[in-house]
Curated annotation (Swiss-Prot):
Its main location: membrane. One of its GO terms (cellular component) is proton-transporting ATP synthase complex. Belongs to the ATPase delta chain family. GO terms for molecular function: proton-transporting ATP synthase activity, rotational mechanism. NCBIfam families: ATP_synt_delta, PRK05758.2-2, PRK05758.2-5. Coiled coil: none annotated. It is found in: Cell inner membrane. InterPro entries: ATP_synth_OSCP/delta_N_sf, ATPase_OSCP/d_CS, ATPase_OSCP/dsu. F(1)F(0) ATP synthase produces ATP from ADP in the presence of a proton or sodium gradient. F-type ATPases consist of two structural domains, F(1) containing the extramembraneous catalytic core and F(0) containing the membrane proton channel, linked together by a central stalk and a peripheral stalk. During catalysis, ATP synthesis in the catalytic domain of F(1) is coupled via a rotary mechanism of the central stalk subunits to proton translocation. This protein is part of the stalk that links CF(0) to CF(1). It either transmits conformational changes from CF(0) to CF(1) or is implicated in proton conduction. This is ATP synthase subunit delta. Keywords: ATP synthesis, Cell inner membrane, Cell membrane, CF(1), Hydrogen ion transport, Ion transport, Membrane, Transport. It is a peripheral membrane protein.
Length: 177
């Protein structure tokens, strides 16, 4: 987790509350995603760490974003620039996404496997996890050859390790004790 999460959280909460109030959550997430990508640009990163006046910086940032930001998105950029916080935009986006997922009762579940899983396998995992967590599930699939075979499922603090690597590690622990 980034060191800027504490700084980013109030901006994300304000943006999320505004977006919910104005029924524009998807639009706000898109604006924040675009603005976060702009901060990752090498030239923009240089400007963000430079000594530009906040007003000049916000004008430059808004000009680069162009039509991607509506008036309210531009206002957020201005406030963040005044407080020298534009560099935390990626963390604002991350926090916004977490707030959205929590409000929509969606659990993010990470599935790690040695090989690409079929659509049928993914559907079975989604079904089982939705039943177990009592909420909708969004899968984030990763491939890690060190798993060897089987899968590892992570949802918050819960970890289900059905991998060959996990079994071998547990067997090694038993043999050593």
């Amino acid at each position: 987790m980034s060191e800027f999460v504490t700084v980013a959280r109030p901006y994300a909460k304000a943006a999320f509350d505004f977006a919910v109030e104005h029924n524009s959550v998807e639009r706000w997430q898109d604006m924040l995603a675009f603005a976060a990508e702009v901060t990752k640009n090498d030239q923009m990163a240089e400007l963000l760490s430079g000594a530009l006046a906040p007003e000049t910086l916000s004008e430059a940032f808004i000009a680069i974003c162009g039509e991607q930001l509506d008036e309210n998105g531009q206002n957020l950029i201005k406030v963040m620039a005044e407080n020298n916080r534009l560099k935390v935009l990626p963390d604002v986006l991350e926090q916004f996404i977490h707030l959205r997922a929590a409000s929509e009762a969606i659990a993010e579940v990470e599935v790690i496997s040695a090989n690409q899983l079929s659509d049928e396998q993914l559907a079975r995992i989604v079904s089982a996890m939705e039943k177990r967590l009592s909420r909708k599930v969004k899968l984030n699939c990763k491939i890690d050859k060190s798993v060897m075979a089987g899968i590892i499922i992570r949802a918050g603090d819960m970890v289900i390790d059905g991998s060959v690597r996990g079994r071998l590690d547990r067997l090694a622990d038993v043999l050593q004790s």
